[in-house]
Design a protein with these regions (language model features):
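Glycine/serine-rich anion-binding loops at beta->alpha junctions
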Residues: 60-76, 155-171, 375-393
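Structural signature of FAD isoalloxazine-binding scaffolds in flavoprotein oxidoreductases
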Residues: 78-96, 216
């Protein structure tokens, strides 16, 4: 929704949007002044970067937390995930240049010619590829694209394990949907567009969980048995009422140069599925996999087989986690989270990159968190793994001590205490 920039700024200053911001950021309306100031700042950034605009729109897309189903999405499995109260926000306004111009704070300006939306090999692994791919996808759905200037600010740390890339894709999707689609596409479709752009234009074979959690919002369970029509169901749970805090621990490891590690997981799982007569593991009954185990080992190698064991088990765990949450059985839920974490490390092997000896940051983070929690709470690798973050569910009475202990090991600001955001991609 477009408004004049002075009107936006006055409304933000006067607290007109306080209730909306309180919902998005899981805080009281009286605590939203700093949130409103962020939106005023992106309006300033828009004008400083691109010059005067008569009107603009304001948008938000949250980071996400994966709660269950580690690397199950690309095998058409089940996941449990939620949106969190850190996000990317943007101000967007029309331009007359037939270009999509995107300025993210701290990055170079990215410009896409809307007359040229074909995928480019030399653009793979770049922001331009994601933008071009999303524009192409919306154009295919009937969007009448026109010039647009976008200024983005983020408090979703890159490589943080809460998926800054998915938040970016969803944010662009929300903007394009609001500005150019007469018949709006659904949050599910926005997620699918982001995944398609990342797969086809960016060149990364990601699953759909990250984009779906950011786009749909709140806590959801998703069944990807039919990827074109994933089944999305809300899961009503309030971790704070259960006495649990959600912490995301930044291990300090870098995602750089790990694309091959990530890509190997779906590739190896698909190789196992192929031996068993399927395309992905969801196509293959577990009993068939067991019967074909010797052949899978010969053709795919033992690491691929162990990864398949993980995917089957974690897929089943998601259903058990959802049932436990529905029943309010948090002890069982936490046991399942810990089981998933052990399986990821031992079978999926996405905690330590192959051959790394001196740098095993995610492993150290898990070990330290488990030591501080003892037999309480739960700890697991978070998201894609290898680098980035660890997830911990911490009893609230232990939170201050846990946070201080982890930051003494990892560094100040490395323990993020988050809340589940009730809404996904949003137009303010």
């Amino acid at each position: 929704m477009m408004k004049s920039i002075p009107v936006w700024k006055q409304e933000l200053s006067d607290g007109v949007h306080a209730a909306r911001l309180a919902s998005l950021y899981c805080c009281a309306p009286a605590e939203t002044a700093s949130k409103a100031a962020r939106y005023a700042a992106v309006l300033d950034g828009l004008e400083k970067t691109f010059g005067f605009h008569a009107e603009a729109g304001l948008y938000s897309a949250p980071g996400r937390t994966e709660i269950g189903g580690n690397h199950t999405d690309h095998q058409h499995g089940r996941v449990l995930a939620g949106s969190v109260n850190i996000d990317m926000i943007a101000a967007a306004a029309p331009n007359d240049k037939n270009q999509l111009r995107v300025q993210s704070e701290g990055y170079d300006l990215c410009v896409i010619d809307l007359n040229d939306l074909e995928a480019r090999k030399d653009e793979e692994n770049t922001t331009a590829a994601l933008l071009r791919g999303e524009c192409a996808a919306f154009a295919q759905r009937g969007a009448k694209l026109a010039g647009l200037d976008v200024y983005i600010s983020s408090n979703v740390p890159k490589g943080s394990g809460v998926s800054s890339s998915a938040a970016f894709e969803v944010l662009i999707g929300v903007i394009l949907n609001d500005c150019f689609m007469t018949e709006k596409v659904s949050p599910i479709a926005i997620a699918q567009i982001g995944q398609w752009a990342e797969n086809v234009y960016f060149g990364k074979p990601c699953g759909l969980m990250d984009q779906m959690a950011s786009s749909v919002g709140n806590i959801i369970t998703i069944d990807f048995a039919s990827p074109a029509k994933p089944v999305v169901e809300p899961v009503a749970v309030d971790f704070s009422k259960a006495g649990l805090a959600l912490c995301i621990l930044d291990s300090g490891a870098d995602h750089a140069d790990l694309t091959d590690e990530y890509a190997a997981i779906p590739a190896e799982c698909r190789a196992v599925a192929a031996v068993c007569g399927g395309e992905v593991l969801r196509d293959v009954p577990f009993e068939t996999f067991l019967a074909k185990l010797p052949e899978c080992r010969r053709q795919c190698g033992d690491r691929a087989v162990l990864r398949a064991f993980h995917v089957y088990a974690d897929n089943d765990r998601v259903a058990k986690q959802v049932a436990a949450l529905h029943d309010g059985d948090f002890d069982t839920f936490l046991c399942l989270v810990n089981e998933s974490g052990r399986s990821s490390w031992e079978y999926l092997q996405n905690v330590i990159p192959a051959g790394y000896k001196e740098h095993q940051e995610v492993g150290v983070t898990i070990a330290a968190a488990k030591h501080l929690l003892g037999d309480k709470g739960a700890v697991r690798v978070h998201g894609g793994g290898f680098a980035g973050t660890v997830q911990a569910f911490v009893p609230v009475e232990m939170l201050d001590e846990f946070k201080a202990g982890m930051e003494a090991i990892l560094g100040e600001g490395r323990c993020h205490v988050l809340s589940i955001r009730p809404e996904g991609g949003a137009v303010l």
